[in-house]
């Protein structure tokens, strides 16, 4: 059995910045998985952990090439799309650099479109 505990990233300055959450995850980011006394962070690390810990319900394909393709797609999002469009970056652009809302929107749309175009090409070529 598992229990989800939502973390509101904006309300009251972001629940991820509260002392209790910071004690679990010093990065003050989501997700954080607590399992059997272990505190795990980062989506891909959690994916790998769950896949290895619960092999009867695999999250990754059985073959090495299939697993590599899934990891490549996940890393495309985790490394190329998400980091430059996440909430911390957008708040920094707004608060510290005073980048106007329309420029932030253009920034976001550009990097998301570029990343997903690459992802679509990879998906088409993997058939």
List PLM regions with ranges:
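Cytochrome P450 catalytic-domain "roof"
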Residues: 30, 122-127
């Amino acid at each position: 059995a598992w229990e989800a505990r939502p973390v509101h990233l904006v309300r009251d300055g972001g629940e991820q910045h509260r002392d209790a959450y910071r004690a679990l995850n010093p990065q003050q980011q989501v997700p954080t998985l607590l399992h059997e006394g272990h505190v795990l962070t980062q989506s891909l690390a959690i994916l790998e952990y769950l896949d290895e810990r619960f092999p009867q319900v695999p999250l990754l394909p059985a073959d090495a090439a299939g697993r590599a393709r899934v990891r490549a797609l996940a890393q495309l999002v985790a490394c190329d799309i998400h980091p430059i469009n996440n909430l911390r970056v957008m708040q920094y652009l707004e608060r510290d650099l005073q980048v106007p809302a329309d420029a932030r929107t253009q920034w976001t749309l550009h990097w998301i479109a570029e990343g997903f175009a690459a992802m679509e090409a990879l998906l088409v070529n993997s058939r």
